């Protein structure tokens, strides 16, 4: 493709749409990041950034964080709701609550809180869903508005800690998920002499669509039914504590792709709110939970990896629906709270690593089979001869199917001992040559060709062996088929010569990325520049800032990767602010209760027993360095 342009690359990888303006492709074919929207012309080349970090001693893979993206996401979400409130003359405010389960890393939480440090009245709070998370937010919430929302299942200790938070000066909303939690709250609040701030999680009848739709609906794991909510109201009245009920919460599930689902959920929950007010409850906060989606594939659709709405539309719909319902019931408008963790964090982090090798099919000349060869091989040669003679378009599909059928028969004959290994190898090479030739002759404009084009792209794709663990760094790609944009970090100024799939370095056949953003859709292979052993080849995995770190596991004992915080200064200078070392081999051994110190003693015994004296020190040093080393491959330079 001599007419390839950078615009073709941008469209081919759909960068413009999924990146939200934070990532792009330069005119030189390099992937860049623009972390500071105030200075959009200040860009960082990710390829050069990674090489600089390696020179500074930071081994790949490395997770790179851009805190300025977090700041922008916080402020843009608050601004969207502020504008919607003004537009619809809504008579209350908006509070953004960050659920730290999405990414509990201290750097991430602190940067989110710092995003509104200059505001006189911050619009930020924190959410906890467990006792460890609550202990964290009790220490950090004073940097925000000191609002804490406590979700999740609770025991007496959890409730005591939440009530102690009130004594520490925080505004702590204890959201009741089960009816039994109310009894514990009443007892512990009386014992501590603290008036609790209570919330209810309503179990809506409406259920949104998506991978997390089980979070809503009548069979949801969480929340109270209408009858249970009435019981809570009655028990609070009996204890003269109805004024403590101040918040209504619901959650449709993460990554809600359709704005109509959000409207419908808010509408139903809004009526719960107004009915509670009519019963005398002092509810003044309306917590819509999560659900604000991330457009991972950039298609602006209702797919599980996308969303059919923008930020302004999201805020407008919530404010508009709630305004109308409150006016209908003649009830005061509550403060709106959202827990939009995925939206805040997904874009800020990129995993950068290197391709350590490839397995690629290269067309080879094939010679006709010997005259005495089985007839099957002669049939395959005939198909190839017909194809190389430039068969017409109508015959292409027939030739392809004949070749596939012949290959299956060849495998069957080999299994029966009727085909030699050399004959089987010839049949496989002949089939690959037919596939390669057919692939080049088919046209995507012909709808009958498209399924075969997809099939051949997958069959003939290069295998890129990439220095990372899918299970550690992209667990959702494996566990729930989540799509993450993947890009080579350079060479995009030239037309892609190959299609490839990315395989990790675990000893597991599931360690493969099998979905890729390609234009306005999802494909099973990715168009890429050809790999060369003579030059470094870096790959970026994007939008990995939400959930992936905390969900990652240590399959094959591949641990946490190195990470770095990178900021672009007002003068355009790139500043690598901090680097956090990933797990060493000794670290991951300890995680599974293996004693690295004891192992070292065993090594010494074995070395003394089996190794010559003049080699012992060197061998022991190698073993000790191995225990202290990175769990990933370290040959990139």
Curated annotation (Swiss-Prot):
Enzyme Commission number, as recorded: 4.1.1.19
Coiled coil: none
Modification sites for N6-(pyridoxal phosphate)lysine: 101
Keywords in alphabetical order: Decarboxylase, Lyase, Magnesium, Metal-binding, Polyamine biosynthesis, Pyridoxal phosphate, Spermidine biosynthesis
Disulfide bonds: none
Pathway linked to the protein: Amine and polyamine biosynthesis; agmatine biosynthesis; agmatine from L-arginine: step 1/1
BP GO annotations: arginine catabolic process; putrescine biosynthetic process from arginine; spermidine biosynthetic process
Cofactor(s) the protein requires to work: Mg(2+); pyridoxal 5'-phosphate
Catalytic activity line of the entry: L-arginine + H(+) = agmatine + CO2
InterPro entries referenced in this protein's UniProt entry, alphabetically: Ala_racemase/Decarboxylase_C (IPR009006), Arg_decarb_HB (IPR040634), Arg_decarbox_C (IPR041128), Arg_decrbxlase (IPR002985), De-COase2_N (IPR022644), Orn/DAP/Arg_de-COase (IPR000183), PLP-binding_barrel (IPR029066)
Annotated substrate binding sites: 286-296
Enzyme class label: lyase
GO molecular function, one term: arginine decarboxylase activity
Highest taxon, organism lineage: Bacteria
Similarity annotation: Belongs to the Orn/Lys/Arg decarboxylase class-II family. SpeA subfamily.
HAMAP family per UniProt: SpeA (MF_01417)
Function: Catalyzes the biosynthesis of agmatine from arginine.
Record protein name field: Biosynthetic arginine decarboxylase
Organism: Shewanella baltica (strain OS195)
Gene name for this UniProt entry: speA
């Amino acid at each position: 493709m001599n007419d390839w342009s950078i615009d073709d690359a941008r469209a081919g990888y759909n960068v413009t749409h999924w990146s939200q303006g934070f990532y792009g492709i330069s005119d030189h074919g390099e992937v860049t990041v623009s972390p500071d929207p105030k200075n959009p012309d200040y860009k960082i080349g990710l390829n050069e950034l990674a090489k600089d970090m390696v020179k500074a001693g930071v081994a790949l893979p490395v997770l790179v964080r851009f805190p300025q993206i977090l700041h922008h996401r916080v402020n843009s979400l608050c601004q969207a709701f502020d504008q919607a409130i003004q537009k619809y003359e809504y008579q209350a405010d908006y509070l953004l609550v960050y659920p730290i389960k999405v990414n509990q890393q201290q750097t991430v939480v602190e940067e989110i809180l710092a995003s509104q440090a200059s505001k006189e009245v911050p619009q930020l709070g924190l959410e906890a869903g467990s006792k460890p998370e609550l202990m964290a937010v009790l220490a950090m919430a004073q940097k925000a508005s000191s609002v804490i929302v406590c979700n999740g299942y609770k025991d007496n200790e959890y409730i005591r800690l939440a009530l102690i938070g009130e004594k520490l000066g925080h505004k702590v909303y204890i959201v009741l998920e089960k009816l039994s939690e109310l009894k514990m709250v009443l007892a512990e609040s009386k014992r501590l002499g603290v008036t609790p701030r209570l919330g209810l999680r309503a179990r809506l009848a409406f259920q949104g669509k998506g991978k997390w739709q089980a979070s809503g609906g009548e069979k949801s794991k969480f929340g109270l039914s209408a009858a249970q909510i009435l019981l809570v109201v009655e028990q609070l009245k009996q204890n003269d504590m109805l004024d403590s009920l101040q918040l209504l919460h619901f959650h449709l599930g993460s990554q809600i792709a359709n704005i109509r689902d959000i409207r419908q959920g808010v509408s139903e929950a809004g009526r719960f709110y107004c009915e509670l007010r009519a019963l005398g409850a002092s509810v003044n906060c309306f917590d819509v939970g999560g659900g604000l989606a991330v457009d991972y594939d950039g298609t602006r659709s209702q797919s599980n990896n996308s969303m059919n709405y923008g930020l302004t539309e999201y805020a407008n719909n919530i404010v508009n629906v709630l305004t109308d319902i409150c006016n209908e019931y003649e009830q005061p408008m509550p403060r709106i709270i959202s827990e939009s963790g995925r939206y805040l964090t997904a874009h800020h982090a990129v995993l950068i690593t290197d391709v350590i090798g490839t397995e690629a099919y290269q067309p080879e000349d094939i010679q006709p089979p010997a005259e005495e060869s089985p007839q099957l091989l002669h049939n395959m040669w005939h198909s190839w001869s017909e194809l190389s003679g430039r068969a017409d378009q109508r015959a292409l599909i027939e030739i392809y199917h004949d070749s596939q059928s012949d290959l299956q028969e060849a495998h069957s004959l080999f299994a029966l001992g009727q085909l030699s290994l050399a004959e089987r190898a010839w049949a496989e090479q002949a089939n690959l040559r037919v596939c390669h030739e057919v692939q080049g002759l088919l046209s995507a404009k012909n709808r009958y060709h498209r399924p075969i084009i997809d099939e051949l792209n997958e069959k003939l794709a290069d295998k890129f062996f990439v220095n990372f663990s899918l299970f550690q760094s992209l667990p959702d790609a494996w566990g729930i088929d989540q799509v993450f944009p993947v890009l080579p970090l350079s060479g995009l100024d030239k037309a892609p010569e190959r299609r490839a799939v990315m395989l990790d370095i675990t000893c597991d056949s599931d360690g493969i990325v099998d979905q890729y953003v390609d234009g306005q859709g999802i494909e099973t292979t990715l168009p890429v520049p050809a790999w060369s052993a003579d030059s470094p080849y870096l790959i970026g995995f994007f939008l990995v800032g939400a959930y992936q770190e905390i969900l990652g596991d240590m399959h094959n004992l591949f641990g946490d990767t190195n990470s770095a915080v990178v900021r672009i200064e007002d003068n355009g200078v790139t500043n690598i602010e901090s680097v956090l070392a990933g797990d060493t081999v000794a670290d991951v051994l300890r995680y599974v209760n293996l004693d690295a110190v004891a192992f070292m003693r065993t090594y010494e015994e074995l070395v003394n027993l089996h190794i010559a004296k003049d080699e012992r020190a060197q061998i022991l040093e190698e073993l000790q360095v191995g225990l202290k080393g990175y769990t990933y491959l370290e040959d990139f330079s």
